[in-house]
């Protein structure tokens, strides 16, 4: 009696974790790219190279520049950093937190943005999409229409970049080479 062989990529491909909620026609195209091992090539052609914001200091400056360009009246950001505790291949891509502390007789709020370390080696547009998303939470806490309108105001290609970032994460989860 022979046991059928199922490849790892078939199992992962069948559910496409990062692409849940997208139309089946689109998922079919992604499955074809994966089967033909062309997903990485397509992404590399569209997004050649990585960014130069590999340190926490550079990421902070990058985030501040975007905030100053689009959200001057938003509360200040006290900390921006890459965080290796964010398990991007399991849950979040970035985190925004508002930490409230008692200082003297007053309550002081501090905003923090943390980005998964996998984005240290990502193409710059993917990092921009994550930072824009987290910055939008300074004004809009929930993922609602106003939130996504703000994301699109800061990055007109936001939805395409989100999809392509999900493709890139799918590629990484399959163990294929990074761009």
Give the location of each predicted region.
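Walker B beta-strand of ABC/ABC-like P-loop ATPase nucleotide-binding domains
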Residues: 131
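Walker B catalytic acidic pair
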Residues: 134
């Amino acid at each position: 009696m022979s046991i059928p062989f199922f490849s790892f990529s078939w199992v992962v491909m069948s559910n496409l974790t990062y692409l849940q909620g997208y139309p089946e026609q689109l998922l079919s195209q992604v499955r074809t790219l994966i089967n033909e091992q062309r997903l990485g090539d397509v992404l590399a052609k569209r997004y050649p190279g990585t960014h130069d914001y590999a340190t926490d200091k550079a990421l902070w400056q990058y985030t501040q520049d975007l905030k100053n360009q689009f959200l001057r009246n938003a509360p200040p950001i006290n900390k921006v950093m890459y965080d290796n505790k964010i398990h991007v291949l399991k849950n979040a891509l970035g985190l925004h937190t508002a930490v409230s502390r008692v200082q003297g007789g007053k309550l002081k709020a501090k905003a923090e943005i943390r980005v998964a370390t996998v984005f240290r080696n990502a193409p710059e547009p993917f990092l921009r999409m994550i930072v824009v998303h987290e910055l939008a939470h300074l004004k809009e806490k929930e993922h609602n229409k106003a939130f996504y309108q703000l994301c699109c105001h800061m990055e007109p290609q936001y939805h395409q970049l989100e999809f392509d970032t999900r493709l890139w994460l799918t590629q990484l989860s399959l163990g294929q080479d990074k761009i």
